[in-house]
């Protein structure tokens, strides 16, 4: 298997793809956890950074200004472990999500070939459809883990809504299930399906072309991953912000780091309208910088690990077949 010009949909068996996807999710989650914590803190901040008067009604919660100041504040107030807050359920989420996503992506591609014939759809359209179905299926299967991990990542040191999976997990399940698990499922789909569609379509399109260039350190795949991630995240970021805001809509939202999180009515459209009215257009892109800083390495690490894990598992499979012969 080549890691240069071949397309992901043409590589590996189903079991190898599943194992490689799980490995990629495990590694990627640990690497980008600190940036994810910072991103969520910024996304849940509803006051204007440019208007000091908007800070008058804040009580107790810190005011985060930018990626590095937020990072320093978390380190100072919560220690280095605060940057990996909620990482246990998040690791489980990423492992399951990545395994299901890559397996579904591969399976969908094969079904499209069998149903429509190979080469009927343009490669970018094929990747767009497979990416949408892969992302949607993985989101549906793993969504209960998302609000659990999100709840554990957002509290501060002195006002913890969930202190640990062992201590607060059972109580959280009783209070939130089943509506709390799936209450914003549609918002998750609305964000992840277009994101994964754009990402895989862009990545699969750029990857073969960039592999023909003589880039230093054989970085063509890394460049393709980074470009695809930045483009996809920029297009869908407001939907991700709305999903995070709606996930904290519970009676305990006043106990989080930010005390002034408003209630949103009318679903995704209503939340978008409320944010535009209260915070302006800039409010829809709060935390975009750190999100892009997170998305680029997250996608790069995920795809890099996936490709090499797939190569490893494929090699193991080939050796096993040779030994049986």
From Swiss-Prot:
Transmembrane helix is among the record's keywords: yes
UniProt keyword list: Membrane, Mitochondrion, Mitochondrion inner membrane, Repeat, Transmembrane, Transmembrane helix, Transport
UniProt subcellular location: Mitochondrion inner membrane
UniProt-listed GO biological process terms: transmembrane transport
GO cellular component: mitochondrial inner membrane
UniProt xrefs under PROSITE patterns: SOLCAR
Residue windows of the Solcar repeats: 12-111, 122-209, 216-312
Membrane disposition: Multi-pass membrane protein
Ranges that cross the membrane: 17-35, 92-108, 127-143, 184-200, 223-239, 287-304
PANTHER family given in the database record: SOLUTE CARRIER FAMILY 25
Protein family: Belongs to the mitochondrial carrier (TC 2.A.29) family.
Function: Mitochondrial transporter that mediates uptake of thiamine pyrophosphate (ThPP) into mitochondria.
Entry protein name: Mitochondrial thiamine pyrophosphate carrier 1
